[in-house]
Amino acid sequence: MPKIVDHDERRAEVLSAARRVIARDGLDAATTRAIAKEAGYSNGVLAHYFTDKDEILLSALRQSHQRIRERLARKVEGVTGLAALRELLLDNLPLDAERTQETRLEVSFWSRSLASERLADVQRSEAAELRAAVRDLLAQAKAAGELSTDQNLDDVTEHLLALVDGLSLHLLLYPDRLRRVDLERILLQHLDNLR
């Protein structure tokens, strides 16, 4: 009797393996051989599900973004304004092992995106979606009287996103200087200053 294979499950396993290799060893180390080994499959199995390495990498990035969106949707369900903004921004910081892996993955793709229009398009799309969500939550908070700032909300949005990116990068690069609790404290101070 032939073995029944769940193709979606196998693709997901390969993408999960790709994310682990990238987060642990970097994007350059994410060869098809390394990804196949991490997943426990042969290179031939990867070729059956993906046309090339770039498709695996791009799919791994998209899958990571989708997982983040799903997790965030659960966290902010029924929450609006400043409380939802707080959750959204904290969720984008590497405050636990899962989010640290996601941040390492994301940062690994940043430099590659400078040379790949295809990757850059994915990054721009995701950044625009996040930017719009932050801007909308700021507008909700302002309308609800939760913010006292007179600053342009587009500028506040850029400031908050730059803060999250900077704090995340600093934690990855200088773990001896910053702790996760420091990131949370600094971000929450900035949000409190908007009240």
Regions from the language model: what does each represent?
Residues 1-9, 20:
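N-terminal intrinsically disordered/low-complexity leader segments
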Residues 13, 17-59:
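Helix-turn-helix
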Residues 20, 24, 52, 74, ...:
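Conserved amphipathic alpha-helical interaction elements at protein-protein interfaces in regulatory
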Residues 51-55, 76-80, 97, 101, ...:
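Residues in soluble alpha-helical coiled-coils and helical-bundle/repeat scaffolds
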Residues 59, 70-103, 153-160:
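Hydrophobic alpha-helical connector segments
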Residues 62-67:
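Short, basic, alpha-helical segments at the C-terminal edge of helix-turn-helix-like DNA-binding modules
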Residues 87-136:
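Short secondary-structure transition hinges
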Residues 100, 118-124, 128, 142-194:
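Hydrophobic/aromatic-rich alpha-helical bundle segments in the mid-to-C-terminal region
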